[in-house]
Regions:
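Active-site capping/gating segments
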Residues: 168-204
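Conserved SAM/SAH cofactor-binding pocket of Class I
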Residues: 53-135
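Conserved beta-strand segments of alpha/beta enzyme cores
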Residues: 89, 114-116, 160, 181-184
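A short SAM/SAH-binding and catalytic strip from SAM-dependent methyltransferases
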Residues: 131-150
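Conserved beta-strand signature within the Rossmann-like core of class I S-adenosyl-L-methionine
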Residues: 156-168
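Helix-to-beta-strand junctions that scaffold the AdoMet/dcAdoMet cofactor pocket
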Residues: 85, 152-157
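Class I SAM-dependent transferase core
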Residues: 1-62, 68, 98-115
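Residue-level signal for inorganic ion chemistry
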Residues: 26, 165, 202
């Protein structure tokens, strides 16, 4: 938990309480449904919460804007971002319903009211548009952009697709035919875990 306040100093008391409650809730649910690698749970705040909040260091989601978390699983990056941006609506989408149920239960337990969930695939969503799409370690950029582009509103800022990814992305970016802006996450957060972690933004 201290690692969050190392980088973010202006949380409200409510946000601090919500972040503080996350680990025990995820540990409890992880014993029933595996949403986080067992070996990662001791580094929960660094590897999962702080990693997701890399997005918040570069993007300011506006009050009332709608953000889709594509392939959210148990709620990453959607749940940490929903705590960080309480006036932004986050729509968590995943094809595995039991993982979404974990995100729903945890959001309810900490009093998050700006989260909705949908058990579906992104390509099956119709008649719904979002200001931005966020995702973490879900699929190749080519597929993420193909699924996201039809769901993005036009003429809003910030907009587009934001992905958290790791490893050598040169081939993946080339094959996507996208020209994303790329941030090295270890230039944002200095912990060794973030080496070779990247954040990509494809504007709409």
């Amino acid at each position: 938990m201290d690692i969050l306040t190392k980088y973010f100093s202006d949380f409200t008391e409510t946000q601090l309480q919500q972040f503080a409650a996350l680990k025990d809730l995820y540990v409890e649910w992880n014993q029933k449904i595996n949403v986080i690698s067992r070996k990662d749970i001791d580094n929960f705040y660094e590897h999962h919460v702080l990693h997701c909040l890399a997005i918040a260091t570069q993007f300011e989601f506006k009050k009332g804007s709608e953000v889709m978390d594509l392939g959210s699983g148990g709620g990453f990056p959607g749940v940490p971002l929903a705590i960080f941006f309480p006036e932004t609506q986050f729509h968590l989408v995943d094809s595995i319903n039991k993982k979404l149920n974990v995100a729903t239960e945890i959001a309810t337990a900490i009093g998050l009211q700006n989260i909705s969930v949908q058990h579906t695939r992104a390509e099956d969503i119709k008649n719904r548009k979002f200001d931005m799409v966020v995702t973490r370690a879900v699929a190749p950029l080519k597929d993420l952009w193909r699924w996201s582009k039809p769901l993005l509103k036009k003429g809003v800022a910030p907009n587009g697709l934001v992905c958290l990814k790791g490893g050598d992305l040169a081939k993946e970016i080339f094959e996507s035919n996208c020209r994303p802006r790329v941030w090295e996450v270890d230039k944002i957060f200095t912990e060794p875990f973030f080496k070779e972690k990247f954040m990509l933004h494809v504007p709409n």
